[in-house]
Amino acid sequence: MADLASRITKPDEAPAAAPEAAPVSAPASEEPKAPENETSIEESQSNLVKNEYEVEIKLSDLQNDTESPLYSVSSFDELGLPEAVNRGLLAINFKKPSKVQEKCLPLMLSDPPRNMIAQSQSGTGKTAAFVLTVLSRIDLSKPHQPQALLLAPSRELARQIQTVVQTIGQFCENLIVEAAIPGAISRETGVRGSVVVGTPGTVMDLVKRRQFDISQLKVLVIDEADNMLDQQGLGDQCVRVKNMLPKTIQILLFSATFPDKVLRFAERFAPNANQMKLKHKELTVKGISQMFMDCPTEKDKYDILCKLYGLMTIGSSVIFVRTRETANEIQKRMEADGHKVSALHGAYEGQSRDVLLDEFRSGRSKVLITTNVLARGIDVSSVSMVINYDIPMKGPGEREPDAETYLHRIGRTGRFGRVGVSISFVHDRRSFEALSQIAQFYGIDLIQLNPNDLDDTERKVQEVIKSSRAQAEYVPSATDSAV
């Protein structure tokens, strides 16, 4: 890989060493890929069976059960899904399982139920995988008895997962899916659905108020599990929720990223779990052309952003910033300069956030400025560009590059076999070293854009966005052995 620092236009500034890739054991290779969430869930499957990348499947009982070899399925018919679920898959044009579905579903649907920790790239069908498991486990003759609980880090993602369950389960008679998010559950009736999708805090409140009968829950799903289990507050809430649930519950943990520290905790949270892992360098999607712009100063970032506005509106675009204040400031300045943009972050009330995201999904709003509240899981099929206005950082004083958040941010584009562009702004030694470390960690070559040659930038970006074929194959590993 050509080193980012060698191509960045700042002399005398070498990047710090990249963090080492976490060691993993041995891989098992294969093929496919598929959707993760709402809206474009109906459009995807025809592109999904072409991709090949290596995975590692670790069966917790591999040494004890020699008669249960790892196997995969080549069609949904082989899974023995309920007829109504198969009809739902056909209605949304899901013809063959993606890689994560092909590998995980036979394990998650086995009896007796086993826990699962699954890692797969953004936009490859994780949501559909756990939704199919949920719909196969619940008893539809008890529509008002909660039987499956799906937790997400934000109301936006919870609402989106709710829509996916309803879409795939559209032919499941008596299926009731409720969102356990602030303001959604009536105090008078409480939770009355067989599938409940929510955020941990609201779920805990409902249980404490005796408005959520958890006694017959069969499945617990945690989406974006690395973030949910690692984030202070959310992690504690997840543990408390789990401790309230029946001991026999099946636990499914899904995310695109699982840092070692979080994975160790996840293995305790979901004991004896089957696992699906990927190599670090298989985590980014080739369909996303990853670029960077070396801005002369921090102030120049805004001017360059405005010059890119025409490109941002070819499809839809998401601009990620570090703080709510920055989001508000950019929105005001861009609107004053005659550009139509929206901003969404945690300071907005829940219903306002719902309206803003719905407007963005529908295309009424095409440029959305946001914080990391939308970095994970959100699926809007029209997003063709992601801009990292601020490089994601973490740790005390935000001095450490946040490679996981970078991956989740850029994963808002290039979904389900489509192409997309991500452009990261750097302006000083700290920001370009951070981006360099992220690039080295994932083994990616970033394309440099010249801030003084917007014609060339336009050509490079349009080449990708207007491409007639979405070649979203996964980045091959640097070697054939496991990292």
UniProtKB/Swiss-Prot annotation:
Residues 107-276 form the Helicase ATP-binding domain. It catalyses: ATP + H2O = ADP + phosphate + H(+). One of its GO terms (biological process) is poly(A)+ mRNA export from nucleus. Residues 304-455 form the Helicase C-terminal domain. GO terms for molecular function: ATP binding; ATP hydrolysis activity; inositol hexakisphosphate binding; mRNA binding; RNA helicase activity. The keyword Membrane applies. It is an enzyme of class 3 (hydrolase). A motif (DEAD box) lies at residues 223-226. ATP binds at residues 120-127. InterPro entries: DEAD/DEAH_box_helicase_dom, Helicase_ATP-bd, Helicase_C-like, P-loop_NTPase, RNA-helicase_DEAD-box_CS, RNA_helicase_DEAD_Q_motif. Its EC number is 3.6.4.13. SUPFAM superfamilies: P-loop containing nucleoside triphosphate hydrolases. Keywords: ATP-binding, Cytoplasm, Helicase, Hydrolase, Membrane, mRNA transport, Nuclear pore complex, Nucleotide-binding, Nucleus, Protein transport, RNA-binding, Translocation, Transport. CDD domains: DEADc_DDX19_DDX25, SF2_C_DEAD. Pfam families: DEAD, Helicase_C. Associates with the nuclear pore complex. ATP-dependent RNA helicase associated with the nuclear pore complex and essential for mRNA export from the nucleus. May participate in a terminal step of mRNA export through the removal of proteins that accompany mRNA through the nucleopore complex. May also be involved in early transcription. Belongs to the DEAD box helicase family. DDX19/DBP5 subfamily. The Q motif is unique to and characteristic of the DEAD box family of RNA helicases and controls ATP binding and hydrolysis. This is ATP-dependent RNA helicase dbp-5. It comes from Neurospora crassa (strain ATCC 24698 / 74-OR23-1A / CBS 708.71 / DSM 1257 / FGSC 987).
